[in-house]
Amino acid sequence: MVTRRHLLASASLSATLAALGITPEALAASRVKLGNAAPFNFDALIERARAMAGQPYTPPATAPADILAKIDYEAHGKIKFDTAHALFADGPGQFPVTFFHLGTFFRAPVRMHVVDKGEAREIVYDESYFDMPADSPARKLPRNSGFAGFRFQESRLGDQKKLDWKKNDWVAFLGASYFRAIGELYQYGLSARGIALDVAQAGRAEEFPNFTHVWFDTPSNEHADSVTIYALLDGPGITGAYRFVMHRGKGVVMEIDTALFLRRDIDRFGIAPASSMYWFSETAKGTATDWRPEVHDSDGLAMWTGSGERIWRPLNDPPRVMTSAFSDNNPRGFGLLQRDRDFNNYMDGVHYERRPSLWVEPLEGWGEGAVQLVEIPTDDEIHDNIVAMWVPKAPARAGSHYRLRYRLHWLADEPYPTPLARCVATRLGNGGQPGQPRPRGVRKFMVEFKGGPLEKVPFGVKPEAVLTSSRGTFSYVFTEAVPNGVPGHWRAQFDLTVDGKEPVDMRLFLRLDGKPLSETWLYQYHPFQSPVGPVAS
């Protein structure tokens, strides 16, 4: 028997639908239930967000709280979306859409819509879209309760034996304005979100506005590698309209166009925020903290400044909440990266070595401001304790509006690698000399750089370590080739003597004949006492 699926696979979608007399809208309706049609375009969505900002915030209606409370972690894990109801499972386009169910951890409903030829129809929630146990509390939810989020699945047109679209997805939106994508190594890791409001701001509770509505543009090209969605953001302090054009190729690249409107003053207005996890790495690890050598989704913040400087700032698990601001004017880009790709440095089946890097690329001038890095103490890998974002210099006041365009690159590395040598490791140890009593308050640093111009340093010539700090004094400063036989692999070594426990900010790069050979290493050192001896009195 020839099914519609067979027909769609053997001919172009437009020809098949025409032959069957089925519109794309009707095709979507065969998989999910749709509401009435209403006009839709991005300009109108922007005006809707603008009008909402002039009105008091109204929290979205949610499903009964007592039912949602029963859909706990265990119950939610037993609810699986039935891919027989996936949006665009038969096309048009190559990437079907599946949905997340509401639960105790995801209570705010997201209204989903499909757009075709300028008309939008809501996708009506129905429990029949999900496989769930007969006694699941989710069966007691009222009709049209909404969804918690959605995923784009891998291509239905690809080799299903290698990458079954029903089991593999490449982007997910779930919770508040959070979303994430896999990189080119097919692994989820850190997250992005639409906006960050008052992160770790003294005297202010952080606000988490929600994407309350999402619209899926019906693809017009059967084999296009991109999808387009629109989203409405709403919260007590902000409204916004978003357009995401998401490309699935080498990793995932998202082009984001957003209009934002403020209901109130925002003390820390975080644009293009990324959230990640860093517990420990080769840099510093407490005795017997964990059996694994390293645990992190990202190991550093990379920045490409408006003046062209390339900067690498290794991440910390600090003793207290720390916020670092790196002032800039029209930054070229920044991102939280996972540079260490060696499994042996993690030894974990969750494959931290495959976690994606996320690079933010402004598509227009962002003016004066700062890349801000928030580091929060953690004692486990289950917490996202790192936030990186752009914060404008001008105050974010009630009534202000912003129009922003930027690109997010979810890749294994930076999309525009520096030609300079890159920092590949930061190692800390006891200061002083082997075999001698170790002086108090002295820490030894070993910073490794690799590649770029270092590969052409003549034999017998040593680069200069250009080193500064906010306080303390340096000693035993020198550079040497790492004795591993790898060309262009060098390290700078030095001791830092410092009193007290206040953080020390350091800056280092390698130079030869007045020219930089490496990117700039920035580091914030939190003095600590090593649990080893002997220590000089």
From Swiss-Prot:
Q: Give the signal peptide range.
A: 1-28
Report which superkingdom the organism of origin falls in: Bacteria
Q: Which family does it belong to?
A: Belongs to the OpgD/OpgG family.
Q: Name one GO molecular function term.
A: carbohydrate binding
* Protein localization: Periplasm
Q: What does this protein do?
A: Probably involved in the control of the structural glucose backbone of osmoregulated periplasmic glucans (OPGs).
Which keywords fit this entry according to its UniProt record? Periplasm, Plasmid, Signal
One of this protein's Pfam families, by short name? Answer: MdoG
Which HAMAP family does UniProt cross-reference here? MdoD_OpgD
- Pathway info: Glycan metabolism; osmoregulated periplasmic glucan (OPG) biosynthesis
What name does the UniProt record give this protein? Glucans biosynthesis protein D 2
Taxonomic classification, please?
Bacteria, Pseudomonadati, Pseudomonadota, Betaproteobacteria, Burkholderiales
Q: What gene name is given for the protein in this entry?
A: opgD2
Q: How is it modified after translation?
A: Predicted to be exported by the Tat system. The position of the signal peptide cleavage has not been experimentally proven.
